[in-house]
């Protein structure tokens, strides 16, 4: 499985939990440095950000993907739209949460969000 990380660096412990939850080995982590310029249109920045992951059109469509979205909500929304356009579906998304009472602040894997399954379920409620 290929992890595309648009957020903070994932640790070996995070990846071990991902492998346990998904039942698949992480073959590669693509680290994408994410910074948005408030003075420029966000859609073009999201496009460039996803481009910078360096995947080919075939890879976007055929690799088993897990995405760690940017923390900034507008960036995350646009990155998701861009990814859906390239993959043809909503990718699985990693959700991290703060570890209670950790100093310094630490984060742990909370769950893997299956956005495509959520979308398909929601369509039944139309």
Q: Where is each model-derived feature located?
A:
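Long, low-complexity, Lys/Arg-enriched
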Residues: 1-62, 78-81, 85-126
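Elongated alpha-helical scaffolds
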Residues: 71-79
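Short glycine-rich phosphate-binding loop at a beta-alpha junction
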Residues: 62-71
């Amino acid at each position: 499985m290929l992890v595309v990380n648009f957020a903070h660096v994932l640790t070996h412990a995070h990846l071990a939990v991902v492998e346990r939850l998904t039942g698949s080995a992480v073959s590669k982590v693509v680290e994408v440095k994410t910074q948005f310029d408030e003075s420029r249109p966000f859609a073009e920045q999201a496009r460039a950000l996803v481009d910078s992951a360096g995947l080919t059109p075939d890879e976007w469509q055929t690799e088993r993907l897990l995405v760690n979205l940017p923390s900034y909500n507008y960036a995350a929304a646009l990155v998701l739209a861009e990814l859906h356009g390239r993959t043809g579906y909503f990718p699985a998304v990693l959700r991290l949460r703060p570890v209670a009472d950790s100093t310094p602040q630490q984060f742990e894997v909370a769950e893997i969000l299956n956005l495509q399954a959520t979308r398909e379920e929601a369509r039944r409620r139309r």
